[in-house]
C-alpha cells in the first residue's frame, strides 16, 4: 500500500510504500503489558534496616502491676520501646527489598507490542479515541520529508506544524495541561501535562531543539522508539509524524 509524502508546506511531493509493520493486528493487551513493564523497571527496590527500632535493652514485667504488658526499658525512664506503637519502635510490616516489583514481558511479546503500537498510529478511530484533534491532518500515517529533521527554530516548527495540520492538537495539549488536583502538588507532581504529537525521525539533526518547547510534543529517533512513546498511559493511537528515513528504518527492522 502506497501513501503520500508531504513537504514542510503540507503539499504532497511523492509516494512511499508502507512497511508491513503498519498492518500488524491490534493487540491492546500486549501493549498494556509492555508499557507497565517499562514503568516498573524504573522503580528502585527499597527496604529498611532489619535492626531498626530493635536496638534497645527491654524487659516485660508481666501481669499484676496495673501496667500494660509491653516491652519497657530496664533503666529509668521506663517508657515503652521496641514494639510498633512505641516511640522509636520497629515498624510492623516494613518494605522489603525481596518484594517483586518488576513486571516482566517476553521478548517476542514485547516486539509484537511495539509493532502493534506502530500500526495503531495509522488507525483513525484509535487516534481519535485517544483524544487527538486530526480534523486538518491530511493522512495517517503522516509522513514528511527528511528536511524536518534539520529544523532548529521553534518559530519555524510552529509554522510547519500548522501547515501539516497538527497544530490544533498542540493547542489542545497546552489547554489540558495545568496544576494537578490533590496532594500530588506537594510531592513533586505539581503539573499534569497532556501528550500531543510524536515526531519520529531517522536521525536527530536539530529537530529536538526546534520542537522541545511545544507543549506535549516529543521527538524520538526511530532506533530508540518504545511502546511508551506510542502508547502513553497504555493507551495506543498517538498522533505521530514520521520522516521518510524513519519509515525506511522501520522497513529494515520489522519488514
Swiss-Prot record:
A GO BP annotation: translation
Keyword RNA-binding included in the entry's annotation: yes
SUPFAM superfamilies xref list: Ribosomal protein L4 (SSF52166)
Keywords assigned: Ribonucleoprotein, Ribosomal protein, RNA-binding, rRNA-binding
InterPro entries reported in the protein's UniProt record: Ribosomal_uL4, Ribosomal_uL4_dom_sf, Ribosomal_uL4_euk/arc_CS, Ribosomal_uL4_euk/arch, Ribosomall_uL4-arc
Alphabetized GO MF terms: rRNA binding; structural constituent of ribosome
GO cellular component: ribonucleoprotein complex; ribosome
Keyword Cell membrane: no
Gene3D superfamilies cross-referenced by the UniProt entry: 3.40.1370.10
Free-text function comment from the UniProt entry: One of the primary rRNA binding proteins, this protein initially binds near the 5'-end of the 23S rRNA. It is important during the early stages of 50S assembly. It makes multiple contacts with different domains of the 23S rRNA in the assembled 50S subunit and ribosome.
Family of the protein in this entry: Belongs to the universal ribosomal protein uL4 family.
Subunit structure, interactors included: Part of the 50S ribosomal subunit.
PANTHER family per the UniProt record, alphabetical: 60S RIBOSOMAL PROTEIN L4 (PTHR19431)
Protein name, as recorded: Large ribosomal subunit protein uL4
